[in-house]
């Protein structure tokens, strides 16, 4: 029956059913009848419709929702020219590790990332906004910093998240951007919008994949930035001309100009465009884009106020509530974050991020039974992965439901997608073994964690403690030095190394390590006692 359908109608049907490759192939066959399919023929409406539909299909194949996906590359971090206050007031910055003043679990209970924030219950790219101070810190890869580690280039993410099959075409690119007369297209609003999205989403992918080869061979970042600017400039020119043609009354084009400015790192210009768009038409997406700008400018309080303004216009909007909760979580205000995540669940009781974050908060607040209820809820919703079963196993163990503990960890090991996940499961199994007093099993589990991931700093630290209990002092010191070099933001390796050095009489190294421990966790009482004791020793010399 499909062969009897009108080709354009069939292509539109493929597009509506998200069969974008079939849609693009059918549109290509229709356009082959025209000698040049680079531009739509205004005299043939069918060709023009097929051209627009193919552009939209190619765009959808690599489309990424930029509201949630936001990753800063090393080049963007280290070459950023935006001036941000180096000594902001407490509670007003995301770039500095937040002080725990809200009654949440301390660093001794809840681990932190390299950026200085507590580990969240839900992995999301936006947690990468904590900027490292040096290039060495930026490329370091400890496990707990996976949520704060930058990738090589932010433009490279479009290739990995998009559809790889569309990066190359046997007949060359669908549209030759250098031959387009953008002024002519800007006078046709529907055509211009489809063309803009194609340039912004699809062509950026094609250009960056060629450029990554240049960066790989030459290792030069300016090439990447220059070509990236060129692509966004095409989209920006089209958006500017279309805005001018609409007499500056079309809010959609202002949002697109703001997106171009944001991707180019021109945050103040993006802010102006988003604000202008909000004056004309208040949309949830515009609030979210503008909040992203304020987060990039390290103004979380302004972003919070903006979200609350959005809630006045759109009461109960889940994305706005979730945005507030994320910012509170990044500012280490766990109690406020949990309250807003609960508000999210009142509006959408299947919101995975809210359920996971509330469950994580209960677990680290010494309430594993309540956390278990939230993780079981995720299991009932159909989520079936290694991370969930790993969390279920830990909750069952600490809630003293031992019959389900090992079964959950077995499922987690079988569902682990990579070696890093398997290493985390073995590490947690080592904790279970320590809890039941089987040090030999714990030793083997920590070893297996290191076999799967030799950058697992926590496993090195715990293995060193077990070696110290066996009396292997030098081996324990070596393991602790490895752990502290892999994860300098963790206080445990520094404190353990200081304690061992103090016991064997190496007071100088003990004092240096204790100072590092205090810098990582200023409220650690045992570190403060050790430093006080060492200073008394030095005063007596």
Curated annotation (Swiss-Prot):
Keywords: Bardet-Biedl syndrome, Cell membrane, Cell projection, Ciliopathy, Cilium, Cilium biogenesis/degradation, Cytoplasm, Cytoskeleton, Disease variant, Intellectual disability, Membrane, Obesity, Protein transport, Repeat, Retinitis pigmentosa, TPR repeat, Transport. Residues 118-137 are annotated as: Disordered. TPR repeats lie at residues 14-47, 251-284, 285-317, 318-351, 352-385, 386-419, 423-456, 457-490. GO terms for cellular component: BBSome; centriolar satellite; centrosome; ciliary basal body; ciliary membrane; cilium; cytosol; fibrillar center. Pfam families: TPR_16, TPR_8. It is found in: Cytoplasm, Cytoskeleton, Microtubule organizing center, Centrosome; Cell projection, Cilium membrane; Cytoplasm; Cytoplasm, Cytoskeleton, Microtubule organizing center, Centrosome, Centriolar satellite. SUPFAM superfamilies: TPR-like. One of its GO terms (biological process) is non-motile cilium assembly. It comes from the Eukaryota. Part of BBSome complex, that contains BBS1, BBS2, BBS4, BBS5, BBS7, BBS8/TTC8, BBS9 and BBIP10. Interacts with PCM1. Interacts with CCDC28B. Interacts with PKD1. It is linked to Retinitis pigmentosa 51: A retinal dystrophy belonging to the group of pigmentary retinopathies. Retinitis pigmentosa is characterized by retinal pigment deposits visible on fundus examination and primary loss of rod photoreceptor cells followed by secondary loss of cone photoreceptors. Patients typically have night vision blindness and loss of midperipheral visual field. As their condition progresses, they lose their far peripheral visual field and eventually central vision as well. Bardet-Biedl syndrome 8: A syndrome characterized by usually severe pigmentary retinopathy, early-onset obesity, polydactyly, hypogenitalism, renal malformation and intellectual disability. Secondary features include diabetes mellitus, hypertension and congenital heart disease. Bardet-Biedl syndrome inheritance is autosomal recessive, but three mutated alleles (two at one locus, and a third at a second locus) may be required for clinical manifestation of some forms of the disease. This is Tetratricopeptide repeat protein 8.
């Amino acid at each position: 029956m499909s062969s009897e359908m009108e080709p354009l109608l069939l292509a539109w049907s493929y597009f509506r059913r998200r069969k974008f490759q079939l849609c693009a192939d059918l549109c290509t066959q229709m356009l082959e009848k025209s000698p040049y399919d680079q531009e739509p023929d205004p005299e043939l409406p069918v060709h023009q419709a097929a051209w627009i539909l193919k552009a939209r299909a190619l765009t959808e194949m690599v489309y990424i929702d930029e509201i949630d996906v936001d990753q800063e590359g090393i080049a963007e971090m280290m070459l950023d020219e935006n001036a941000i206050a180096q000594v902001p007031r407490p509670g007003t910055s995301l770039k500095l590790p937040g002080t725990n003043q809200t009654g949440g679990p301390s660093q001794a209970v809840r681990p932190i990332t390299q950026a200085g924030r507590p580990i969240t219950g839900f992995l999301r790219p936006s947690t990468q906004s904590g900027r490292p101070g040096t290039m060495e810190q930026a490329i370091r890869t400890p496990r707990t910093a996976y949520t704060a580690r930058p990738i090589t280039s932010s433009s490279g993410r479009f290739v990995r998240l998009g559809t790889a099959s569309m990066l190359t075409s046997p007949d060359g690119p669908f549209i030759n951007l250098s031959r387009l007369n953008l002024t002519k297209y800007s006078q046709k609003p529907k055509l211009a919008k489809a063309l803009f999205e194609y340039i912004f989403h699809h062509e950026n992918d094609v250009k960056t994949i060629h450029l990554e080869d240049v960066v790989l061979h030459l290792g030069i970042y300016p090439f990447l930035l220059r070509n990236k600017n060129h692509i966004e400039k095409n989209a920006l020119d089209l958006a500017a001309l279309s805005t001018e043609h609409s007499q500056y009354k079309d809010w959609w084009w202002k949002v697109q100009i703001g997106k171009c400015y944001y991707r180019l790192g021109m945050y103040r210009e993006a802010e102006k465009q988003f604000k202008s768009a909000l004056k004309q038409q208040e949309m949830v997406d515009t609030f979210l884009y503008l909040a992203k700008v304020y987060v990039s400018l390290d103004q979380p309080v302004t972003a919070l106020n903006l979200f609350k303004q959005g809630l006045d216009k759109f009461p109960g909007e889940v994305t706005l509530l979730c945005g507030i909760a994320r910012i509170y979580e990044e500012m280490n205000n766990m109690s406020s974050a949990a309250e807003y995540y609960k508000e999210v669940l009142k509006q959408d009781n299947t919101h995975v991020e809210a359920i996971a974050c509330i469950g994580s908060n209960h677990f680290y607040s010494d309430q594993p039974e309540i956390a278990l209820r939230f993780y079981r809820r995720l299991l009932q919703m159909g989520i079936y992965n290694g991370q969930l079963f790993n969390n279920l196993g830990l909750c069952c163990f600490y809630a003293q439901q031992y019959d389900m503990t090992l079964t959950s960890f077995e499922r987690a090991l079988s569902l682990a997608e990579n070696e890093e996940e398997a290493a985390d499961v073995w590490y947690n199994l080592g904790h279970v073994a320590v809890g039941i007093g089987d040090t030999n099993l714990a030793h083997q589990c920590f070893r297996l964690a290191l076999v799967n991931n030799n950058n697992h700093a926590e496993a090195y630290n715990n293995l060193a403690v077990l070696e110290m209990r066996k009396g292997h002092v030098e081996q324990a010191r070596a393991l602790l030095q490895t752990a502290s070099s892999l994860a300098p933001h963790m206080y445990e390796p520094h404190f353990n190394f200081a304690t061992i050095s103090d016991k064997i009489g190496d007071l100088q190294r003990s004092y240096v390590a204790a100072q590092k421990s205090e810098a990582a966790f200023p409220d650690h009482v045992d570190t403060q006692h050790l430093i006080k004791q060492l200073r008394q020793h030095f005063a007596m010399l």
